Design a protein with these regions (language model features):
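Active-site neighborhoods and metal-handling regions in enzymes and metal-associated proteins
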Residues: 13, 21-282
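Short, flexible, mixed-charge glycine/proline-rich loop motifs
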Residues: 6-12
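Short cysteine-rich clusters marking metal-coordination/redox-active sites
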Residues: 17
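A generic local structural motif
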Residues: 3-5, 241-242
Length: 282
């Protein structure tokens, strides 16, 4: 998650900019308004405590979620072959700051993330065999790619988290079908959300549809509560048994993020400590 320096005096002109752009401070944010400090509760201090939101909190989460949606709409208007994932990061970063918000992924996990490395960018960009948490770089999108862009912003202390899949140009029929059926998995999961239901109902609906088509469900990552903190309880597994898991209650807020593979469900983490890819390249 992102936090700018308390003041520009913390960085010299030739230091890398705090924003993660890779540019020197003098060429980037020197003399420009810094973002507001991020909330302290970016990671749940009690990961099993499910937060039932108040009406005030729900309105704050709606506001941050609307900005997240708008950022994804902006990407949809601009993304195409020839664009780099760093460009996507720059679009999101600059527009988030312009709106007075904070890009939550930037510097998220400082001292707690994989190998102690904070996430260095403002958005996750996951291409093809990358399951999630891909780090933007100079890779250029080409015809036939599929990419998931995961955006989380903080507005007035509240978190809005969403991702969207994009198809670049013409892709094989099997690839397009995977994207379409993963969307269907999401819709089937959402259809199970109701007060009095169990989170296992969501996972079961997703798993049943995916496996009926010969796909596998990633088990190493899941959806999660969100809103007051970046990651809250409950965990929303994308597989499961009906009638099991946590009780869904009115005013809970959580993400459903089905990750569906053509091949095996297992993942591995690349050397950057964040990027999760399929073990078989599918």
């Amino acid at each position: 998650m992102k936090k700018g320096p308390e003041s520009s005096k913390e960085l010299s002109r030739n230091d890398p900019c705090w924003c993660g752009s890779g540019k020197k401070f003098k060429k980037c944010h020197l003399g420009r308004e810094q973002p507001p400090p991020r909330p302290k509760a970016s990671v749940s201090q009690n990961p099993r405590r499910i937060l039932i939101k108040t009406e005030e909190q729900l309105e704050g989460i709606r506001k941050s979620s609307r900005l997240t949606r708008d950022l994804l709409d902006m990407i949809e208007d601009r993304i195409e072959a020839g664009v780099s994932t760093n460009q996507i990061n720059e679009w999101v970063h600059e527009e988030t700051l312009t709106q007075g918000a904070i890009p939550a992924p930037l510097n998220y996990g400082r001292g707690k993330g994989p190998r102690g490395r904070p996430f260095p960018k403002s958005v996750c960009t996951s291409i093809n065999e990358v399951i999630c948490h891909g780090i933007p770089n100079e890779q250029i999108l080409v015809d036939g790619d599929i990419i998931n862009v995961d955006v989380t912003c903080i507005v007035d202390g509240y978190f809005g988290d969403a991702s969207r899949m994009f198809i670049i140009g013409e892709v094989p029929d099997a690839t397009r079908k995977l994207v379409e059926e993963t969307r269907k998995c999401l819709e089937l999961g959402i259809a199970q959300v109701r007060p009095g239901g169990k989170t296992g109902d969501i996972g079961h609906a997703i798993q049943t549809h995916a496996e009926s088509l010969g796909y596998s469900v990633v088990r190493d990552f899941c959806g999660h509560g969100v809103g007051v903190e970046f990651h809250e309880a409950p965990q929303i597994l994308h597989y499961g048994t009906p009638g099991t898991g946590d009780l869904m209650q009115e005013n809970m807020v959580f993400t459903i993020e089905p990750m569906i593979n053509m091949g095996r469900p297992e993942s591995r983490i690349l050397g950057d400590g964040w990027t999760a890819v399929t073990v078989d390249g599918s």
